[in-house]
């Protein structure tokens, strides 16, 4: 396993009064504006670099700031990055390949001066400021690459320092070239040194002439002192670290170099993302090359990008996360999350207690349904779960039939589109996972409702809803048994108790929904469930409401009606009142 930062706990940093998060090789922070996503990223950066923070970076200046981190995957290879002295200093604190440490800073109330410390956990107690640990962490994790939301793009792209974002990316890109040509480059650089250094074999005669002239003046004051001009040649590292970008625009005659500030933010952002994509490409092609431990932070990678480019950037970031880089992004775009990674995305929100990083879908699956976690992970992966994280409420529906037309029906009946930031419709493959997925989504702080066929009642009666519906279900069971015994209703399953509902087929449930003596009780159950966030079709299933089944011509007729403002949907949907009631319930 590649060494990585596995988790952080943040206290009193900016908007983060107290929150924690589990980090993965690819971690996405999602949430509305000003929720504190960028503050979590900055807290992680501060944990690693230990720069001095000001009082404006503190939630409550009367209390210390603390960010605790856990590094996992430390091996002998990792320790080889350290000096022997630092290896000895850090070794007592590494437990099963894990290092737990915390960076703290507090302000003296009287003087206002800041006091910093780096504490390390030895398995039983915290040790304050043990020597060598800060340097060891810096060697394990090179300085992170941070691409903010375009605030310093122009200045950053024109600087000639490896401390800039582009400088760091360029350094990572050319590292393979540097290793490949190091001997050749170093030889050529040393040749230049022979002409310019104070003791060069082929020192320029003009430099000797200057030395002679200057020494005549110096010797007038100090006869035993002499000087020689010396121009140090840059090392190969220094040359590559000074790399920058020149931007050219095509013209009829020849390309013209222009300052990057003359280009729009879209072009600037595209250049940054292009470098990230190319870095991912070469790392994927050179799978045998040494993996990096560098962290990459990007605020809103989707910013200024064309929708078709967002998916490409996402895949590049995932590739980097599989090549040793640890990638942490903040995003407002569901396109930045594949279904595979949505379950591990961290929803960030803010309330009166500051910024909170909620537990992920994966964490809640393990917490609530550990025994069936593989099936639930699959269920979330197969649904469009990346979109639900950006909504205030989720409507879970059974199967994709409903989602195919519900958005269009909503617009047709209500006269306006369903706002995806308010409500997201998520299709679930079969009714068996509806309750479990609902509980998990509710557990991560998103309100959830359910739409299902009437046969979902067999699942409902196995939950706490059974007590809620006890009177209505007793009445239904009594009416059902009477109708069966009298021969008025014929079912394929013998019904004597609530438990026997589990064996009733969907076709038989439709019969029950439309039978004169049981219909009233189905409507009572429907209303009570509706008031509690579950909508079951009173007619049995959605096909019964539409009035048709699977024929493509019938669906085409409905879709044609939904797309044509002049056509009345009442003429197409058999039980329009029931459909309208559901749409208004949304």
Curated annotation (Swiss-Prot):
GO MF terms here are: ATP binding; exonuclease activity; metal ion binding
Which enzyme class, named as a word? Answer: hydrolase
The record's region (Toprim domain) falls at 393-586
Keyword Hydrolase found: yes
Spell out the SUPFAM superfamilies in the cross-references: P-loop containing nucleoside triphosphate hydrolases (SSF52540)
Activity at various pH: Optimum pH is 7.2-8.8.
Q: Which residues bind a divalent metal cation 2?
A: 402, 541, 543
Q: How is the cofactor bound?
A: Mg(2+) gave the most activity in a maltose-binding protein fusion.
Q: What is the effect of changing residue 455 to A?
A: No longer kills recB-recC deleted host cells
Residue numbers binding a divalent metal cation 1: 398, 453, 455
Q: What is the effect of changing residue 543 to A?
A: No longer kills recB-recC deleted host cells
Q: What is the recorded phenotype of mutating residue 306 to A?
A: No longer kills recB-recC deleted host cells
Recorded catalytic reaction(s): these are: Exonucleolytic cleavage in the 5'- to 3'-direction to yield nucleoside 5'-phosphates
Per the record, the domain of life is Viruses
**What family is reported?**
Belongs to the class 1 OLD nuclease family.
Q: What is this protein called?
A: Old nuclease
